[in-house]
Amino acid sequence: MEQLIMVDALKRASAKRITVVAPFYGYARQDKKHRGREPISARLMADLFKTAGADRLMVVDLHTSQIQGFFDGPVDHLFALPLLTDYVGRKVDRSRLTIVSPDSGRVRVAERWSDLLGGCPIAFIHKMRDPRIPNESTTGKVVGDVKGQTCIVIDDMIDTAGTITKAVDALFDEGAAEVIVAATHAVLSGPAIERLKASRVSEVVVTNTLPIPEESRFDRLTVLSIAPLLGRAIREVFELSLIHI
């Protein structure tokens, strides 16, 4: 809400151009109606920014790329993937590495991870979610060979950490030697911190697209700065009028 008020203030002050930098795009998971009588909140957020006076949006790792079409104007969709893969690639033995998607919907992202890390194998976890129960999923079978491997579970966000911790358990049940979690957005709501602390995950790697208070940090949590990525993008937009990132 504060950002919308700032945009409105700038518009009323006759700003020539307003670019909204929103590293975490709110309500991105509500990008369609799962059942009747539900809002499409991701579209509403885009409409609110446009109505307030925004000319351009800059976001990081949208839940689905199609959300870019909700905003009537340019959308710069940035990716934290190079930042995360660079960190992970320097930490692990790539010969024993497997990239794991927590569901079938993020397999393509896992493929991009694999490409940047030298073509390591991919696995995914078959997951069922009840749309009537928010933030709850039932983890099913691990599809792929993870025995003896260092598994990197990748996702766009960690909310309550239910999906992630169930995935970690499933991987260890299939013989994984080590599991590291990597995600862009650390929402960390509700029981997330307790679940992650109690899990067998070796490290949780996130970025600071959202502020992470000190009380939510723990020994196995690594927070990478998204500032260099945003800084380069902002410079290119205002100096070159296009993005090369």
Residue map of PLM features:
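PRPP-associated nucleotide enzymes
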Residues: 1-243
